[in-house]
């Protein structure tokens, strides 16, 4: 059975030769960097907070030291990526420090806008990192993950949240790109 992820589909849509070299010929290069480490650490930090908020209480979630949790997740992700690359560090200590400082600011903003961004009233947390596996044609499956999945208790609609940690926002072309949205 063939499997296609969102990133594979995106690469194929933009450059079929790059897709062939990377996924068929297996000539791809590891892209481990601070952005991957930071994105994974920030996702895990926010997802843990939301899990506690929706499944225990908002009060309990607000007692979590998010800065410490983010630091621990950054170290964990750094070590995980370092194992993959051997002795080479996936990023510098300076990059880790800079991104950690940015992450603390993001988390401060996140908690200050919590009531506007995430309401507990009328919503339930269905899943974090919900795996998707849909057959898009016989023998080919699209695979992916939903970062956060909420359900509106009143109308039964689902809210899909895709956490983003890009250093740049999307321009109007990216927002209108049907591959991305």
Language-model segments: residues:
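Mg2+/Mn2+-dependent nuclease catalytic core
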Residues: 123-181
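Nuclease catalytic cores
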Residues: 9-10, 14-54, 100, 104, ...
């Amino acid at each position: 059975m063939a499997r296609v992820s969102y990133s594979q589909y995106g690469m194929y849509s933009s450059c079929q030769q790059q897709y062939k070299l990377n996924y068929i010929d297996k000539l791809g290069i590891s892209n481990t960097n601070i952005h991957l480490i930071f994105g994974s650490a920030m996702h895990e930090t926010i997802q843990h907070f939301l899990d506690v908020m929706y499944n225990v209480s908002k009060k309990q979630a607000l007692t979590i030291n998010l800065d410490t949790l983010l630091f621990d997740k950054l170290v964990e992700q750094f070590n995980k990526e370092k194992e993959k690359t051997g002795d080479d560090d996936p990023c510098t200590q300076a990059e880790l420090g800079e991104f950690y400082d940015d992450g603390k600011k993001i988390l401060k903003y996140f908690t200050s806008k919590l009531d506007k961004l995430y309401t507990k009233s009328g919503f339930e947390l269905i899943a974090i990192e919900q795996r998707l596996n849909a057959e898009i044609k016989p023998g080919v499956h699209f695979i992916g993950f939903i970062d956060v999945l909420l359900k509106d208790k009143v109308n039964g609609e689902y809210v899909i949240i895709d956490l983003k940690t890009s250093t740049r926002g999307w321009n109007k072309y990216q927002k209108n790109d049907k591959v991305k949205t």
